[in-house]
Every structure is written in C-alpha cells, then in structure tokens.
C-alpha cells in the first residue's frame, strides 16, 4: 500500500495476469475436440470476471485507519497515558482493548486501532479488519476488499475447473486414439493441464477455508489468536479448576447472518463483484467502514454497558502507563 508500483508488487501481479492469459490462449487454440465457440463462451467470461475481481481487490484496498483523519494520534505519549482519547464513535463502540483497559494505538502509524485492526509489516501500515497479507496480490485482505477476495477465489476455482476439464478431455482423446504413436504430445497443453490440477486443488481448499471463515465471521489472525488463548485458558482451567471458555464476539449467531454481513443480502451481491447495498446506503456515515462491527444483541448489551463505564472512568481518573499487550478479539465467559 505504501508503494503499489514497486517491483515486489508488480512482479506477482504481472505473473498472475500472464498465467491467466496464457492458459486461456492455450485452451482456446490447442483444443480441437470441443467447438471453439463453446470454449470461448465459457472460458472468456470466466477469465474476464476473475481478472476484473483480481484487480478490484488491489484497487479497492483493505482500508486503513489512516484514511480517517480523526483517528490520527496527535501525541503518542499522551495517548499511551490516557490524556488523549479516540473519537467518541470509536470509544463507545470499541470492544477490544489492551489488558489495562486502554484503547489500542499503533506506534508506527500513530493512529487509533479500531476492533480487528492490525499492523501489516509487509505493507507497513495498519489494516482495518486485517485477514492476511497475500503475496499473489502484493496486498492485504481486509475490510474493504474481503468480499472481492472471496469472489476472486470462487471465480478462479471455476476457471481452473473448466480449463482442467477441457485440457484433460483433449489429452484423453489424443491418447485413446493412439496418436501418441505418430506424434509427440502437446507440451503446452500438458503444462496447462498440470497447472490447472495444482491451481484447482490448492485454490479450492483455500476457497472452502475462506468461506468457512466468513460463515464464522472470523479472520485468519483471529483464528490463530483463538488457538493461542485457548491453550492458555486450558492451562488456567487445569491450574485453578475453573470452567471458562472463549467466544468469538463477532459471530452473529448463524452462518447466513455472518455471510450476509460480509457478502451482502442478495444473490446479486454474492455473485457479482459489486459493492454491497448496505455499504452504498451508509456511504456518508461511519457505518460499514470497518471502524466498528455488529455483534449479537445479548453480547452487545453486556459488553457495551461495561465499555461505557470504562470510557467514563478513563476520561476522569488519573492516567497510568499503558501496557502494549493486546487483548484478543474474544470474550472470556464463565460457564458456571
């Protein structure tokens, strides 16, 4: 994000684009057992929408607190000591704090860090609802481009499947006809077929994992955080005989609710690489910007009541130094 035209960012993007175009060209020109019009009718639209979504992920970007001037920290030391506080819309809606109850601050970007925001060392900038940094995009997946990233994975899986079926059919026909006794195999076609196998298997697995994450309303970072805190909690329960468990506070209660929260509420939004309708409706507000997130009503009432009290106290009491350790995007619930 800090230098989108650098060599390290251009190389993976050019490589990905060339692989798409090369595989499409070989499929359209080297396959003779399937009508050319049928190949073009299926391959070209799938290729076009996959590449469009690929560059949509890059152009849209994940979003950063730096995009919001009111999240800039003017005095880092004052913010760490509690003398400077984030905007009220963040302080009243923020659910993940440091261990000492203070708001999270990025010492590199000098910004307040909303819920689910993390600093990416590759991009060297804070990312809203950061999921992961993808080297094939040379870009992070975050709040603003997560929907398009999921759609790109689905389009790529479909494209790889079509190429795999067509090339395998052509090679199978060539082998069954005994043509291998008279001519060499088409190595371009064989290379595309092998690449399609590798891409289809790997991207299909990652697509399934990503869709599962969407249905759980969890990011990859939060999954790893949950694992770490779950191990710590098991040690705590064994040591003190407690019976506590971890809960993802951003889980809206059902897979469909979580899916619609990210992908939109209609089939049109799910299939087409367009902005969600709720994002367009809230374009001139702070909603749907990755600055705060919806949670289940029962969880929201419980957490926000304590958060409002903490916010009032932080604005009145004498400040103390702030610890740097972050509290995970989870809630420890007493099961008794």
From Swiss-Prot:
Keywords per UniProt: Acyltransferase, Lipoprotein, Membrane, Palmitate, Transferase, Transmembrane, Transmembrane helix, Vacuole
KW Transit peptide (keyword) present: no
Catalytic activity: L-cysteinyl-[protein] + hexadecanoyl-CoA = S-hexadecanoyl-L-cysteinyl-[protein] + CoA
GO molecular function: palmitoyltransferase activity; protein-cysteine S-palmitoyltransferase activity
Topology within the bilayer: Multi-pass membrane protein
PTM field: Autopalmitoylated.
UniProt KW Kinase keyword: no
Role this protein plays: Palmitoyltransferase specific for VAC8. Palmitoylates VAC8 at one or more of its N-terminal cysteine residues, which is required for its proper membrane localization.
Domain remark in the UniProt entry: The DHHC domain is required for palmitoyltransferase activity.
UniProt name for this protein: Palmitoyltransferase PFA3
Name of the coding gene: PFA3
């Amino acid at each position: 994000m800090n230098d989108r035209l650098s060599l390290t960012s251009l190389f993976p993007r050019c490589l990905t684009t060339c692989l798409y175009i090369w595989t499409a060209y070989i499929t359209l020109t080297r396959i003779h057992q399937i009508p050319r019009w049928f190949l073009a009718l299926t391959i070209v639209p799938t290729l076009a929408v996959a590449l469009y979504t690929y560059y949509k992920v890059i152009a849209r970007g994940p979003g950063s607190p730096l995009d919001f001037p009111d999240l800039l920290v003017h005095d880092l030391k004052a913010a760490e000591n509690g003398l400077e506080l984030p905007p009220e819309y963040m302080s009243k809606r923020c659910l993940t704090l440091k261990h000492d109850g203070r708001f999270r601050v990025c010492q590199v970007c000098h910004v307040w860090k909303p819920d689910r925001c993390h600093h990416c060392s590759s991009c060297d900038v804070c990312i809203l609802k950061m999921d992961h940094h993808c080297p094939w995009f040379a870009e992070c997946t975050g709040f603003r481009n997560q929907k398009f990233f999921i759609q790109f994975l689905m389009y790529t899986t479909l494209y790889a499947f079509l190429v795999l079926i067509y090339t395998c059919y052509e090679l199978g026909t060539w082998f069954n006809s005994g043509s291998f006794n008279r001519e060499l195999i088409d190595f371009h076609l064989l290379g595309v077929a092998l690449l399609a196998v590798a891409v289809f298997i790997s991207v299909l697995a990652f697509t399934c994992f990503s869709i599962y994450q969407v249905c759980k309303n969890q990011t990859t970072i939060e999954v790893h955080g949950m694992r770490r805190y779950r191990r710590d909690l098991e040690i705590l329960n064994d040591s003190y005989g407690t019976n506590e468990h971890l809960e993802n506070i951003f889980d809206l209660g059902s897979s469909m609710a979580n899916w619609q929260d990210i992908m939109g509420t209609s089939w049109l939004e799910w299939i087409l690489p367009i902005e969600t309708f709720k994002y367009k409706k809230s374009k001139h507000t702070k909603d749907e910007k990755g600055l705060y997130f919806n949670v289940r009503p029962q969880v929201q009432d419980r957490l926000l009541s304590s958060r409002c009290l903490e916010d009032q106290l932080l604005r009145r009491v004498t400040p103390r130094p702030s610890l740097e350790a972050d509290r995970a995007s989870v809630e420890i619930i007493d099961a008794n």
